[in-house]
Amino acid sequence: MRVLPILCSVVDSRLVSLVEPSALVEEFLPLNRRRTRGDPPLTIAELERWMELRWLLEHSLAGKSPIDDQGRPMRRTLRVPTHLKVRITRGSTIDITSTQEISEGGLFLITRRPLTPGTPLHLEIDDGDLEAPIEVEGTVTWVRRTDDGDGPAGMGIRFDHPDEEQQAAIGTLVERALSEAL
């Protein structure tokens, strides 16, 4: 999309700091809900605005651009820092860990024993305010074996085919984390 390279060249950390984060969140959330659920679909102008807002929020939250070297988004969903308790089940093995961040497409789990990419998992995500944890299937997509400048050791998990109820619950967690992060 033509807006991303232009946006990347114009917006820097000084401009991001001038924008009121709560105003960004207020404008982003309804567009993000419609983009995720597709009802009604976003117009091209709304999609471009969603991409601008996502860039500003990601830059504000992570301090780095979510755009790769060729001007393409690195991820389809906004990652938001949050610490949630997660119970991982893989066969008869159970582990409890926490998140570093979450998005509507997946999460990053902090662990010194990351699993191999491609490993399927059953996740139970609990933020302490839910009546019951959100249960969803996921797959390990990448690992960071040691703590480094990019963050703690752990693994990136993609949510696999969440149903509407799971998507809505995950969306609520992301929205709550976004509101708390800014």
Locate the predicted segments by residue:
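N-terminal helix initiation/capping motif
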Residues: 1-102, 175-182
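C-terminal output/interaction extensions
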Residues: 20, 34, 38, 147-182
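Short strand-loop-strand
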Residues: 79-125, 154-158
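Short, conserved beta-turn/loop elements at beta-strand boundaries and strand-helix junctions
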Residues: 91, 104, 143-149
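Short beta-strand-centered aromatic/proline hotspots
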Residues: 97, 135-144
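A generic structural motif
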Residues: 103, 140-144, 161-163
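Hydrophobic beta-strand positions in extracellular immunoglobulin-like domains
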Residues: 125-127, 140
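Low-complexity, intrinsically disordered
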Residues: 129-133
